[in-house]
């Protein structure tokens, strides 16, 4: 009876550690995507600043293009970069939390294995 409970606890802890590792990897991928978005927005903003004020600025939305002005496009790219940066920070906080939980689960798993011997 106790052996079944230990094996069930072992499976649960192992599942939790695997799931946490997958969530950490997924968070790293999301962080890379947001970092790329941030770099693109900052680069585009930098290029827009150097362009003439009298040019027509078009923004693609789905299958159509919207005519906008230079300040609106610059502020849009600033907002996109800021939003991506905030998402990166949130992902970092979540990663720290998940890593703490992973360490705790691994410790519990080791203790469970040691108690079984």
UniProtKB/Swiss-Prot annotation:
Expressed in the distal cell tip of developing embryos. Disruption phenotype: Worms exhibit defects in distal cell tip migration during gonadogenesis, reduced microtubule growth rate in embryos, and larvae arrest and lethality. The keyword Cytoplasm applies. It comes from the Eukaryota. It is found in: Cytoplasm. One of its GO terms (cellular component) is prefoldin complex. GO terms for molecular function: protein folding chaperone; unfolded protein binding. Keywords: Chaperone, Cytoplasm. Belongs to the prefoldin subunit beta family. Binds specifically to cytosolic chaperonin (c-CPN) and transfers target proteins to it. Binds to nascent polypeptide chain and promotes folding in an environment in which there are many competing pathways for nonnative proteins. Has a role in gonadogenesis. Heterohexamer of two PFD-alpha type and four PFD-beta type subunits. This is Probable prefoldin subunit 1. It comes from Caenorhabditis elegans.
């Amino acid at each position: 009876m106790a052996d079944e409970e230990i094996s069930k606890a072992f499976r649960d802890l192992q599942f939790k550690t695997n799931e946490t590792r997958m969530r950490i990897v997924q968070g790293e991928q999301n962080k890379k995507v947001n970092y790329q978005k941030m770099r693109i927005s900052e680069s585009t903003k930098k290029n827009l600043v150097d362009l003439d004020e009298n040019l027509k600025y078009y923004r693609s939305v789905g299958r159509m293009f919207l005519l906008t002005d230079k300040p609106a496009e610059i502020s849009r790219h600033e907002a996109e970069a800021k939003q991506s940066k905030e998402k990166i920070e949130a992902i970092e906080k979540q990663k720290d939390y998940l890593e703490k939980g992973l360490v705790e689960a691994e410790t519990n798993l080791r203790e469970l294995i040691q108690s079984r011997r």
